[in-house]
Curated annotation (Swiss-Prot):
Keywords of the record: Cytoplasm, Methyltransferase, rRNA processing, S-adenosyl-L-methionine, Transferase
Main location: cytoplasm
Cross-referenced PANTHER family: 12S RRNA N4-METHYLCYTIDINE METHYLTRANSFERASE, S-ADENOSYL-METHYLTRANSFERASE MRAW
Known function: Specifically methylates the N4 position of cytidine in position 1402 (C1402) of 16S rRNA.
Disulfide bridges in this chain: none
Protein name as catalogued: Ribosomal RNA small subunit methyltransferase H
């Protein structure tokens, strides 16, 4: 079954931030189902170029079908940690805009075979790139107690990580934990009772932590962001949509490092303009978007521009 319905978060706000030049070169680093790419392409002339990157084969198949007759579009299957090298391979050395949408696409969440959702029963998987070996099943069934505690604490910021890690180790000693709902049940059974009455799902942060570990998500962000910024043309923009505090902290740290004044304090700043500037503190979904698309609720958009 195909799962291709997806509502792109902060779509218009992101495109406005990019200030798309008709003859510019733009890179969608997380193609998904192409919401950003399609709107960028509408603003490009025949001299413009769009590069679509994704590590998910279903997304790549969708992109190839969508843009099969368009010579202005290049589709590349890779993780964006390889951003600079794959662009260099295509003789692209300078870019006018990059988009990173760090959220899971609806097709990934809604396809039960991918194992991302804690609402649907599926084999534990959670791989963005389905050709890689490490998956959620291996982590849940083979990581030591200490490693489970580490990822739950580091990637989920969970205070009772030891309790759940202990429950997982205990349960898997008698029977392998094979499916998402088996894991959800263990999390519920071993969670503090007050957690079960909170508005957010008790398994949410555990699934987030496992997914981040499976895909090495946070470790590659800083490199990819720095690579993108290093390739910007003057007035080029990097726009990034994050979905949880761990991602947003990395975005802020990288952007602020470029945007801060690096001149010694004793040097007068008359008419001085830093090479990079923040385009905004943060942009969040409108009330209308929140009403229309519940999955946008945690999204934050930030942008950085290269002034010269």
């Amino acid at each position: 079954m195909e799962f291709n319905q997806h509502t792109t978060v902060l779509l218009n706000e992101t495109i406005e931030l990019l200030h798309v030049k008709p003859d510019g070169i733009y890179v969608d680093c997380t193609f998904g189902r192409g919401g950003h790419s399609q709107l960028i392409l509408k603003k490009l002339s025949k001299k413009g170029k769009l590069i679509c990157i994704d590590q998910d084969q279903q997304a790549i198949d969708f992109a190839n079908n969508l843009f099969k007759d368009n010579p202005n579009v290049i589709v590349i299957k890779t993780n964006f940690k390889n951003l600079k090298s794959v662009l260099y391979d295509h003789q692209i050395f300078h870019v006018d805009g990059f988009v990173f949408d760090l959220g899971l696409s609806s097709p990934q969440l809604d396809d039960p075979e991918r194992g991302f959702s804690y609402h649907k029963d599926a084999l534990l998987d959670m791989r963005m790139d389905q050709e890689q070996k490490l998956n959620a099943h291996y982590i849940v069934n083979h990581y030591s107690f200490a490693k489970l505690v580490n990822i739950f604490t580091k990637y989920g910021e969970i205070k009772y990580a030891k309790t759940i890690a202990n429950g997982i180790v205990k349960e898997r000693s008698t029977k392998a934990i094979n499916t998402t709902l088996e894991l959800v049940e263990i999390i519920k059974n071993y969670s503090p009772k007050k957690i079960l009455f909170e508005k957010k799902h008790p398994a949410r942060l555990f699934f987030q932590a496992i997914r981040i570990e499976v895909n090495d998500e946070l470790n590659i962000l800083k490199k990819a962001f720095n690579d993108a910024i290093s390739m910007l043309n003057p007035l080029g923009v990097v726009a990034i949509i994050s979905f949880h505090s761990l991602e947003d902290k990395i975005v802020k740290k990288v952007f602020n490092n470029y945007a801060k004044n690096k001149l010694p304090k004793e040097i007068p700043l008359n008419n001085y303009v830093n090479q990079y500037s923040l385009l905004n503190q943060k942009i969040m979904p409108s009330t209308q978007e929140l009403n229309d698309n519940n999955r946008s609720r945690s999204s934050i958009l930030r942008g950085l521009v290269k002034n010269y």
